[in-house]
């Protein structure tokens, strides 16, 4: 692999993952019904709107699911996969389109589980360090984490003032990640 190919591969992977992360965060903001007037939410919306606007007319959001975000995330993941395949010389041995869509869905699910993991870690650290803070980032993390945590809190309520539900969520995230690795 030449230096130019390696640089191009690095850029495709990292810039593609950054864009995919912003799109996934936009979907998580919508699903959690986070405050869209939060400055960080506004930044994510302004960055992702040019990509999502063409799909909005065809795929409107229904309830907590933003279909335009889901389709765009899978498309970006497929473009990343095709770019990597093209760079490493696998231009002519690409799988059929349904397999590519499957890989795209698995990639997006993997990213969302990783984002959920990091949101949960951030939520735990914030609860120790800055429990009462009103910083926009902290508020956004709380708003994203609460809908994810609430079903686990119902299964495992506080015991003596200590919340053990994140442990159950960590176990669930790990099970999902193992399943995605073997899909």
Regions found by a protein language model. Give the residues of each.
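Selective transmembrane helix interface/packing segments
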Residues: 1-183
């Amino acid at each position: 692999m030449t230096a130019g190919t390696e640089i191009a591969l690095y850029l495709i992977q990292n810039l593609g993952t950054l864009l995919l992360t912003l799109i996934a965060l936009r979907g998580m903001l919508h699903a959690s019904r986070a405050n869209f007037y939060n400055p960080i939410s506004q930044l994510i919306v302004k960055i992702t709107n040019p990509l999502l606007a063409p799909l909005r007319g065809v795929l409107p959001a229904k309830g907590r699911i933003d279909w335009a975000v889901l389709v765009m995330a899978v498309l970006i993941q497929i473009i990343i996969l095709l770019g990597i395949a093209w760079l490493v010389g696998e231009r002519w041995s690409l799988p059929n389109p349904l397999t590519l869509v499957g890989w795209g869905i698995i990639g997006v699910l993997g990213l969302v589980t990783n984002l959920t993991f990091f949101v949960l870690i951030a939520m735990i650290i914030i609860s120790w360090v800055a429990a009462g803070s009103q910083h926009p980032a902290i508020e956004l993390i709380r708003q994203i984490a609460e809908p994810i945590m609430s079903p686990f809190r119902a299964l495992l309520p506080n015991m003596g003032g200590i919340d053990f539900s994140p442990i159950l969520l960590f176990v669930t995230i790990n099970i999902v990640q193992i399943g995605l690795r073997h899909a």
